[in-house]
């Protein structure tokens, strides 16, 4: 897979800025990014954050850049609808890596790891974009035993970080992140045998790491990103191949 990054031209996508009411700053960021995209030669955008994925895929194409292109405050001149026909394929990284797994590019046997895990569906990947299978396929590809929480897929329970929640103090008890971790350890079929709470969103990672501490779950469960499982599984597969070769 050939890829590039925007380096200094990569700024914040603007999702949370927009959610807390800074619409014009959001448009400024959107205009900057689409001009940067137009200067590059590529076929797909791969996002590591479901919020960026949703913003690039669904919200940038809705922006009327022509309305703001001549505004002296706005630092862009782009005056067309961006990606209105979906000519640029926007992917979450789990979708891109799922393609590699299905094509055999990562050479995973599906037996590398033996953890019992549960998976949390991020709002912007799941409910907003109906992507439920790619993360689960990657977890299974590592060999992990995936146990579902009662609230999963379209009924998933938010981590509490969206809409500016990441920067707010929650007065209620338990916090959303604490309640979700309790659900993982008490309401899944595996119960306390759940070893890892798997996420696919950096905001969820932050919220659940905090909830793990404030909810006193530090000795009970580990928060990991799917990417960490894949890296560990690839490492085990490579070591196994070296042992066979020796």
Predicted feature descriptions by range:
Residues 1-246:
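Iron-sulfur cluster-binding electron-transfer modules in prokaryotic oxidoreductases
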């Amino acid at each position: 897979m050939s890829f590039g990054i925007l380096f200094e031209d990569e700024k914040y996508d603007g999702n949370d800025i927009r959610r807390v009411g800074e619409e014009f700053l959001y448009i400024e960021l959107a205009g900057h990014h689409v001009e940067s995209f137009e200067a590059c030669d590529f076929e797909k955008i791969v996002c590591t954050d479901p919020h960026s994925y949703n913003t690039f895929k669904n919200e940038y194409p809705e922006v009327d850049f022509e309305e703001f292109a001549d505004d002296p405050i706005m630092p862009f001149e782009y005056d067309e609808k961006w990606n209105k026909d979906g000519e640029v394929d926007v992917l979450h990284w789990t979708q891109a890596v799922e393609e590699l797994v299905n094509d055999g590019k990562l050479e995973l046997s599906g037996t590398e790891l033996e953890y019992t895990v549960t998976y949390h569906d991020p709002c912007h990947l799941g409910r907003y974009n109906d992507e439920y299978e790619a993360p689960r396929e990657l977890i299974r590809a590592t060999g992990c035993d995936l146990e579902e929480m009662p609230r999963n897929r379209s009924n998933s329970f938010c981590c509490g970080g969206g809409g500016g929640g990441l920067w707010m103090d929650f007065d209620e008890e338990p916090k959303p992140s604490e309640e979700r971790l309790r659900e993982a350890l008490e309401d899944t079929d595996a119960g306390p045998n759940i070893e890892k709470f798997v996420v696919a969103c950096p905001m969820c990672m932050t919220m659940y790491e905090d909830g793990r501490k404030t909810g006193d779950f530090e000795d009970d469960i580990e928060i990991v990103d799917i990417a960490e499982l894949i890296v560990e599984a690839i490492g085990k597969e490579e070591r196994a191949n070296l042992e066979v070769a020796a």
